[in-house]
A protein has these predicted regions:
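Amphipathic C-terminal alpha-helical segment
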Residues: 93-97, 118-120, 145, 164-182, ...
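Hydrophobic alpha-helical segments that form the core
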Residues: 105-111, 155-174, 190-193
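Amphipathic alpha-helical packing segments from all-alpha helical-bundle domains
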Residues: 81, 85, 118-147, 186-189
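Amphipathic alpha-helical segments used for helix-helix packing
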Residues: 98-123
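N-terminal intrinsically disordered/low-complexity leader segments
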Residues: 1-6, 201-205
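Helix-turn-helix
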Residues: 10, 18-60
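All-alpha amphipathic helical-bundle segments outside canonical DNA-binding/catalytic cores
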Residues: 80-81, 104, 126-130, 148-163, ...
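Hydrophobic alpha-helical connector segments
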Residues: 56, 70-105, 158-164, 205
Length: 205
């Protein structure tokens, strides 16, 4: 076993990768410990259960991704460009994951969220919903600004953001099911169509 000081971080990293490349339900504590190089006793020193570890791991991953999304959706960036950058980021990120793991992984929040939504222990589902709501708000702000600037037709940005987020969720899920990055290439085309944007530029990815 490595140093106890980094065992918690290695457990979270192992959990994130295992549930992303596989599934939450199929991932066992033994598998997590093996991948992290941590003994089971150390697992229970840091976490009382697999659920607690998963909540911590997804929260940690979100905090690592958040600065990049903050930059993409900065109010200093024109609203339609924010949406384009978001679509481009999603494609590039999935391409990097495919290069590393050999397949398109999609978004773990969507796949794990669907998997645990009927579980009696709601902690993981609640954490996923919390993170997804943060992501949706990025879209809502960009949509509101685009409408205010006369660039889009979205008088109800909250509703429009939920529709657009569901569209992205569908694309990510289909890309994983089909193991096909091309599903994500025209995300901006559908985005502009849903928002009533008149001009759609070719995808940059």
């Amino acid at each position: 076993m490595g140093r106890v000081s980094d065992a918690r971080a290695r457990l979270m990293e192992a959990m994130s990768e295992l549930i992303w490349t596989g599934s939450y339900g199929a991932t066992t504590i033994d598998q997590i410990c093996d991948k992290a190089g941590v003994k089971k006793g150390s697992f229970y020193y840091f976490f009382e259960s697999k659920v607690e570890l998963a909540v911590a791991a997804l929260g940690e991953q979100w905090e690592l991704r958040r600065p990049e999304l903050d930059a993409i959706f900065s109010p200093t960036v024109p609203p339609l460009e924010r949406l384009r950058k978001y679509c481009d980021f999603g494609y590039r990120f999935q391409a990097e994951l495919r290069q590393k793991h050999g397949c398109v992984l999609g978004c773990p929040l969507f796949s794990v969220g669907a998997e645990v939504c009927t579980c009696e222990d709601h902690r993981l589902g609640q954490k996923i919903q919390e993170i997804l709501e943060y992501k949706r708000r990025y879209l809502e702000t960009a949509i509101r600004d685009a409408h205010a600037a006369g660039l889009a037709s979205a008088p109800d940005p909250a509703t429009k953001s939920r529709i657009l987020f569901a569209y992205y969720q569908g694309l990510q899920t289909q890309a994983r099911i089909q193991n096909n990055l091309d599903v994500l290439k025209d995300a901006i085309v559908g985005t502009y169509d849903l928002l009533g944007v008149k001009t759609v530029e070719p995808a940059t990815v």
